[in-house]
Design a protein with these regions (language model features):
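Hydrophobic residues in beta-strands and at strand termini
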Residues: 42, 56, 68, 76, ...
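Short, solvent-exposed loop/turn elements at domain surfaces
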Residues: 47-49, 72-75
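Beta-strand cores of secreted/periplasmic/IMS beta-sandwich domains, seen most often
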Residues: 53-70, 92-101, 105
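Soluble periplasmic/extracytoplasmic beta-strand elements of cell-envelope proteins
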Residues: 39-41, 63-65, 73-75, 106-108, ...
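Extracellular/periplasmic metallocenter environments
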Residues: 2-9, 15-34, 88-127
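Short, surface-exposed beta-strand/strand-loop-strand elements in extracellular ectodomains
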Residues: 75-82
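N-terminal edge beta-strand
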Residues: 31-61
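Short histidine
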Residues: 70-72, 112
Length: 127
């Protein structure tokens, strides 16, 4: 192979590599954050209506709307600073937070009697 042919081949490979890098990332921008609302209904036995796993992606806004037949507090582990929902029997209560940590986090109900039970989970995927 001549020096000229070698140079043309090297330039072609470099251009193809650059085009791959440019077009590989084009059109794959992450979806913008979403607002997600989940409705849960609780009774003495735990979750009776609503999803057991509340799914989100980093940056999403999550609203949890809860109706319970007993008093207590609902909170999301690792997100205590963001969401604590005080529950009154028969009344709708809600809390909102931004999913700022990826992972799976338990949603726990602490009853007025001190009972502590997981009723659902928040699962946050990386963006």
């Amino acid at each position: 192979m001549t020096a000229r042919a070698l140079a043309v081949t090297a330039i072609t490979v470099a251009l193809l590599g650059a085009m791959y890098i440019v077009f590989r990332t084009a059109g794959h921008a992450p979806a913008p954050p979403q607002s997600r609302t989940y409705r849960l209904r609780l009774d003495d036995h735990g979750l009776t209506s609503g999803p057991a796993v509340l799914e989100a992606v980093l940056g999403d806004s999550i609203t949890i709307v809860v109706t319970s037949n007993r008093a207590g507090t609902l909170h999301v582990h690792e997100y205590e600073q963001h969401i604590v929902i005080d529950l009154e029997p028969g009344r709708e209560s809600s809390g909102r937070f931004t999913a700022d940590r990826a992972g799976r986090f338990g949603v726990h109900l602490i009853g007025a009697d001190g009972a502590h039970a997981q009723v659902a989970a928040v699962e946050v995927q990386p963006r």
